Swiss-Prot record:
Keywords: Cytoplasm, FAD, Flavoprotein, NAD, tRNA processing. It comes from Streptococcus gordonii (strain Challis / ATCC 35105 / BCRC 15272 / CH1 / DL1 / V288). Its cofactor is FAD. One of its GO terms (biological process) is tRNA methylation. This is tRNA uridine 5-carboxymethylaminomethyl modification enzyme MnmG.
């Protein structure tokens, strides 16, 4: 079939949400000519749901995106109205940063970045069709019948694919925030042979700030101590005049209103068909599932400095508008609240992610990548993490360079992608710290140590940032060596100081590092014995040193597990393997192998329903095949 291409690009990204902007920025910064196509330019990097970035596990993803050279962390550091470190009373593995965003500023700042990026064209247009020939992407076709050539296409359409908004018995075609739905593109993906799922998410009502009685709610201020998402941000730029959030609760009256109107709730009347998120359920779902709970938390979150809109976090609903008003007015502090926007549910198509490789390229079509909610995830941060990986790998593919696959031990982004492509998902996927088996080495404080070198090799970390990183890494390494080399001996003067600080005296000589392993001993305590470092250390480096030393035993065990898994990941499975040729593996394992087509022994071992015996049989089979190929080569060489 002949095509009339009017423009040509290396990569075309469809959708300018949080996945799309990261994908397009990464690819263009790597030297590719990129088109970022969006249905509505005004919604670039928009926040149709909660006005925040970060949180448990998610905040670590934002730092990983930053370490690789992405934009989300820098952008939220320019647009937050409140910053808070979560789980400070718990161990370092679960600590994470969360920022309340000024959603308009966030979107505008990201748009400035996109518009000023070299090699990147931003255009408002609707893509209706992905053009494919001989199993390869060749371009796209727009709603206005324009055809653009491309070597790779990245689909990051969020909830727009055949999107439908639902409020009570009202249901209409729409993308997020009442934008246009991408129906022809959804049809096109089905026609291309992809297995499509149907998911659902939702959003709560927004209320007017001046109509809230804050006196009967609990204030939730931000942190005074400076924290940032981006490693490039400076403490002196930390916002001091932060905007508080407020805490209130549902009550018996709220629950009664919901119970009395369940017959009108789309969730229970049969109107909603899509599968909703387990970890962010609607309020009506919570009331039914947790009927024994007397109340549920609700956070009143301002959507920005220059707007009256307040997001009622925890009150996601698709109940009819009149019921929503009664529900809002039953809540303490919201008795006279003016509802500015109605909550709604949105159903949308998504691609079942077992059809993807770990690069986020589809197995079916070469050069076609997908990222974000299109792959069945929920959340801006999960979208950004996938977006940057899809953008990087699309660029690497057309440049003929080795692909980037983040392992589960590299970062939460690696955990997420491996979960998606190996296990799939039957509901909107949300990242949790419990999903990561190596979470003690995937911390908020060490994302740069884990991933900056990768970002540099790819070409996304510039010279200035690399120089700063090298200084930090050298300072960290040098101080760790110093702490290992200096010994504290149990002599009278030393023990006198030890006891003066309130610690048990030394009985044997120990290194400064060993002394610091004591739970009660801080880095500053140790400095009193050995003196300060040659260079003054930043507080963040000191925190990193303390964590690495105090949790060294656990970290060491985790790294041993990583090495074992690495050996399994290095054992590749041929792409053309005939799974029916392998005798003795269980029927369930054979079915799963055919469906997912794992690329390594490590990936195969993580598929649900596959047991160790199946893996052993698979390894024996592959070793036998390798020997057979080797013998055939020897025979040919003798001929």
């Amino acid at each position: 079939m002949s095509h009339n291409f009017t423009e040509s690009y290396d990569i075309i990204v469809i959708g300018a949400g949080h996945a799309g902007v990261e994908a397009s920025l990464a690819a263009s910064r790597m030297g590719c000519k990129v088109l970022l196509a969006t249905i509505n330019i005004e919604m670039l990097a928009f926040m149709p749901c909660n006005p925040s970035i970060g949180g448990s596990a998610k905040g670590i993803v934002v730092r990983e995106v930053d370490a690789l050279g992405g934009e989300m962390a820098k952008n939220i550091d320019k647009s937050y109205i409140q910053m808070k470190m979560l789980n400070t009373g718990k161990g370092p593995a679960v600590r994470a940063l969360r920022a309340q965003a000024d959603k308009e500023v966030y979107s505008k700042e990201m748009r400035k970045t996109v518009e000023n990026q070299e090699n990147l064209t931003l255009r408002q247009t609707m893509i209706n069709e992905i053009l494919v020939e001989d199993g390869k992407v060749i371009g796209v076709k727009t709603a206005t019948h324009q055809e653009y050539a491309a070597k790779a296409v990245i689909v990051t359409t969020g909830t727009a694919l055949r999107g439908e908004i639902i409020i009570g018995d009202l249901k209409y075609s729409s993308g997020p925030n009442h934008s246009l739905a991408a129906i022809p593109l959804a049809d096109n993906l089905r026609d291309l042979g992809f297995e499509i799922g149907r998911f659902k998410t939702g959003t709560p009502p927004r209320v007017k700030a001046s109509s809230i009685n804050y006196d009967v709610t609990e204030i939730q201020p931000g942190d005074e101590k400076a924290n940032h998402f981006s490693y490039t941000s400076r403490d002196e730029d930390y916002v001091k005049d932060q905007v508080p959030c407020w805490l209130t609760y549902t009550n018996a009256e709220s629950h009664e209103i919901i119970q009395n109107n369940l017959h009108r709730a789309p969730m229970f009347s049969g109107i909603v068909k899509g599968v909703g998120p387990r970890y962010c359920p609607s309020i009506e779902d919570k009331i039914v599932r947790f009927a024994d709970k007397e109340r549920h938390q609700l956070f009143l979150e301002p959507e920005g400095r220059d707007t009256e809109e307040v997001y009622v976090q925890g009150l996601s609903t698709s109940l009819p508008e009149d019921v929503q008003k009664d529900l809002v007015h039953s809540i303490k502090g919201l008795e006279n609240a003016e509802m500015m926007r109605t909550g709604y549910a949105i159903e949308y198509d998504m691609i079942m992610p077992h059809q993807l490789r770990a690069t986020l390229e589809t197995k079916k079509i070469s050069g076609l990548f997908t990222a974000g909610q299109t792959n069945g995830t929920s959340g801006y941060e999960e979208a950004a993490g996938q977006g940057i990986i899809a953008g990087i790998n699309a660029a690497l593919k057309i440049q003929g360079r080795p692909e980037l696959i983040l392992k589960r031990s590299d970062g939460y982004i690696g955990v997420m992608i491996d979960d998606l492509v190996t296990k799939g998902t039957v509901e909107p996927y949300r990242l949790l710290t419990s999903r990561a088996e190596y979470r003690l080495i995937l911390r908020h404080d060490n994302a740069d140590m884990r991933l900056t070198e990768m970002g540099r090799e790819i070409g996304l970390v510039d010279d200035e940032r690399w120089a700063r990183f090298e200084i930090k890494k050298n300072q960290f390494d040098n101080e760790m060596k110093r702490l290992e080399s200096i010994k504290l001996k149990p002599v009278k003067e030393t023990n006198a100081k030890v006891e003066e600080l309130g610690f048990k005296p030394l009985t044997d000589a120990v290194t400064a590092k060993e002394f610091m392993r004591r739970p009660e001993v801080s880095y500053q305590d140790v400095v009193q014995f050995i003196g300060p470092a040659a260079e003054e250390l930043d507080e963040k480096i000191i925190e990193l040193i303390e964590t690495e030393i105090k949790y060294e035993g656990y970290i060491s065990k985790a790294l041993d597990q990583v090495e074992k898994m690495k050996r399994m990941e290095e054992k590749r499975i041929p792409a053309n393997i005939d799974w029916d040729d392998i005798d003795s593996i269980a029927t369930e394992a054979r079915q799963k192998f055919k469906k997912i087509n794992p690329e390594t022994i490590g990936q195969a071992s993580r598929i649900s329903g596959v047991n160790p015996a199946d893996i052993s049989i698979l390894m024996v089979y592959l070793e036998g095949k390798a020997r057979s190929i080797s013998k055939n080569k020897e025979k040919q060489n003798h001929v």
